[in-house]
Amino acid sequence: MSFYGQMVGEDESGYLPSANMFLGGVEGHHGWGKDAVNWYVEAHDTRTNMSRTNYSYTHHIYKDGYYQQGYPLGDAMGGDGQLIAGKVELITEDNQRWSTRLVYAKVNPEDQSINKAFPHADTLKGVQLGWSGDVYQSVRLNTSLWYTNANNSDSDDVGASAGIEIPFSL
C-alpha cells in the first residue's frame, strides 16, 4: 500500500508556499490467487487552503490566472473544485484488465466565467467501466464505457471508447 500527495502553493510566505491546493491518495497492489488487484482512492481540492474560493486559479495582475484560453492548466476541473475518485482493477492470469472507477466532484461553485471546462457550478457523479486484453501477440485492445450525471447541466455525459496499443522498439 502507498500513500501519495501533492501540495501546490499559489503564494509565498516566510519562504514557504501558502494559499495551498491539495491532492492526496492511497493505492494498493495485491495478489489474489493467480490474479492481481490494483486499487486507489484519491481526493483533490483546488480551493485555497480547502475553503477560500476565487483565489488560487485567478490573479489580479495575470487576468487568465491558471487557465489557458479558458481551460485549466492544472487539475482538469479548474479552480475551487473538490473531487473524490476511486478505482478497482482486476488483472487476470491471461493479462486481461477489468476495471471500475467512481467519481464525485463539485466544480466551479462561484460560476467563474473563465472556466470553460465547467462554466457553471455543478455536482458530477460518474462511473467508468473498462476492459483491455491482448488480441494478437502483443497488440492490446483497450475499451471503456462511462456515464456522468451532472446536476445542473442540460445533459449528462455518456460515452464509449476503444483504442489499440501496438508496441515497437527504437
Map each language-model feature to its residues:
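Exposed, low-structure sequence patches enriched in small/polar residues
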Residues: 1-170
